[in-house]
């Protein structure tokens, strides 16, 4: 069955030793014989399993599914194989993160190692220790690449190798020496640290914490009253903090340094104690310098750029609002507008807001329209007189001069306002999944749709499809009349082109259409139809419209203009005018051959021809016409009734079949 034990052992030598050490660290001992048996079964039913092994939990779950399918088909799977498979799968679960791949280039000050502590509350345990375990991120993401498990063992379990005189130096509770950043050896797998929880078996023994300290320029000394750390974890060394200091830069470099405010530190301390470690964004705020620390006398006061963290409640509201109502719902637009105008958001903050609340496809749309808006704004800045010195890198927060938060904090107010307008505009163009943006020309008012609802839909579509504000306003005013229903058009028509300067055209249209479709409006229409009065400066006529002259009050056949034309044509063709009234209808001066009237002057219907012939008697239809029976001798006179019945009795009687012939015996 499968390959031999020696081949399996030589093929997976390094992987088997790594699995044994991994299980041993978890408190489970598995014999090499059982592991070889497991890999024999895997070789037989899972030929896709890589030769160098895998640490991806998804692959081991797939192995379990395929082994179950093999068991259902009648193959015998030993019980020890199931036990070993379950143990290995459970041992690999701590290596899986919420996102299977974490970029190691985002670590501040180091591209190799980043340790980020997290904690969670448990009802059964009052205190827990925090232990940072190394996670081989590229191995989990790409389990088929060549991996040296001996080097990986040195990275994952340094404290075991420390006892043997190898591995990196540990930073204990009483040591304050930070860990340096050395280049990776050739062939070593880059790793990133992911926080994992472990409940202490022996509470009397203090845990060992492996911490990464950021560079000195990103650190600050906490205030004396602040206490960092979690229950069951030793405090951080003096002068070090387990998270970097938000950069603080002055807009006036010549001003002397001011006292470092404690408000920012208090916010960070509070969020850290509450477990809010995922929302440390810092919108820029400009605060006036204290007296004596700003500019000299006679100079304008200086301000200092500081960061204040976003509340986690804002990010949660943004995420829930987008999920429940959509990114362009009235609630989300109002919330985003209040955040945008209530904070001095830099490009980094806009990217954080979009990433935390939008789906990947929606964020891609936002980023695309952001870049498109930046290109348009840069063209306007260059065409201005004088040109505005704001480039695309500054509006996007990229490049050598604007890629960091501290550099973006120094952006001028004009650049901040341009970024705000561009990002709000890009957010409005985000479409919900499965929806398409219709053309503004196809937005029409329904027969029973209120006029304000129609205008709101029209403005929303125009805002997404037309970038120029002036052009959008003209299109909305035009379509608000052209695409309205007939009732609203008749109400708006007296106002078209006559709205006073300074007044909003759409507002005047909405006022004119107020109440259309209601009971009061229907009653007014009925009253106007009966009395023909003029109400509200609007003439309501319900007569027919002439298709010849376009006037109201008569039809084309009664149009006086058409009759005059006919008379002129007749006089031209015949050379003479009709002498008198039509002899056929007696109500018009025209020739009888041209009379098209169906009724005369008295209202009597007229036939198609002037004279009709004698009506013909109805003809009898049938095979045998009925002839009256008259007995002989009474021709020309009425015979007696007895003679009539006697004659009828002498008529031959026929049935459907002839009478039967009865033979008479002699």
Swiss-Prot record:
Gene3D superfamilies: 1.10.1200.30, Human Immunodeficiency Virus Type 1 Capsid Protein (1.10.375.10), Retroviral GAG p10 protein (1.10.150.490), Zinc finger, CCHC-type (4.10.60.10). It comes from Homo sapiens (Human). It is a lipid-anchor. Keywords: Cell membrane, ERV, Lipoprotein, Membrane, Metal-binding, Myristate, Repeat, Transposable element, Zinc, Zinc-finger. One of its GO terms (biological process) is viral translational frameshifting. This is Endogenous retrovirus group K member 9 Gag polyprotein. The keyword DNA repair does not apply. GO terms for molecular function: nucleic acid binding; structural molecule activity; zinc ion binding. Residues 624-640 have a biased composition (Low complexity). Myristoylation is essential for retroviral assembly. Alteration of the glycine residue leads to a block in the budding of particles and an accumulation of Gag inside the cell. Specific enzymatic cleavages may yield mature proteins. Its main location: membrane. Residues 604-622 have a biased composition (Polar residues). Residues 232-247 have a biased composition (Pro residues). A lipid is attached at residue 2 (N-myristoyl glycine). Belongs to the beta type-B retroviral Gag protein family. HERV class-II K(HML-2) gag subfamily. HERV-K Gag polyprotein contains regions homologous to the matrix (MA), capsid (CA) and nucleocapsid (NC) proteins from infectious retroviruses. Evidence suggests that HERV-K(HML-2) Gag polyprotein can be cleaved into mature MA, CA and NC under certain circumstances. However, the exact boundaries as well as the size of processed Gag proteins have not been precisely determined yet. A zinc finger (CCHC-type) spans 544-561, 580-597.
